[in-house]
């Protein structure tokens, strides 16, 4: 198995790098690419859904991005220690009827010794927004990396 740096234990710089890498991958909306950052038996809780393994992750993300159109995400480091990282995030997307949503969430991540995520727990709340209220347009520009995203 090849390593996926940075590897635990995390310091502030390596945790920030891991968070930005996750944001970048999720903004591709490529389920296969995203799933590659997780162990083959990674355990997930996403809202009220529980599942395990890369095939289930790919299935979940495929359905998610078929439903959450023009998805764009921002993640910020919240805390880290040892092989764990906590993040807060916001993403925006619209549904098939054209209603825009901003989703606020927190994630708890646990990594194996190779830098692959073996556990992900996500709690998420959705808020309907007007298209004119959007703040997230595609992947984060290079000049905005490392900048804390505002709560509101």
Q: At which residue positions do the language-model features occur?
A:
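A solvent-exposed, acidic/Ser-Thr-rich amphipathic alpha-helical stretch
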Residues: 14-16, 31-85
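Short, low-complexity N-terminal intrinsically disordered segments enriched in polar/charged residues
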Residues: 1-40, 147-152
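A beta-strand edge to alpha-helix "cap/lid" segment located at domain peripheries
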Residues: 1-10, 59-152
């Amino acid at each position: 198995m090849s390593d996926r740096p940075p590897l635990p234990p995390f310091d502030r710089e390596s945790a920030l790098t891991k968070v930005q890498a996750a944001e970048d991958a999720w903004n591709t909306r490529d389920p296969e690419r995203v799933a590659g950052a997780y162990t083959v038996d990674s355990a997930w809780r996403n809202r009220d859904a529980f599942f395990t393994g890369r095939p289930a992750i790919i299935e979940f993300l495929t359905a998610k991005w078929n439903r959450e159109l023009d998805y764009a995400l921002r993640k910020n480091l919240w805390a880290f220690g040892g092989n764990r990282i906590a993040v807060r995030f916001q993403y925006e997307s619209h549904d098939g009827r054209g209603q825009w949503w901003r989703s606020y969430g927190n994630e708890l991540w646990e990594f194996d010794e190779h830098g692959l995520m073996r556990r992900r727990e996500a709690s998420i709340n959705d808020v309907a927004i007007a298209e004119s209220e959007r703040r997230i347009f595609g992947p984060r520009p290079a000049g905005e990396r490392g900048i804390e995203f505002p709560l509101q």
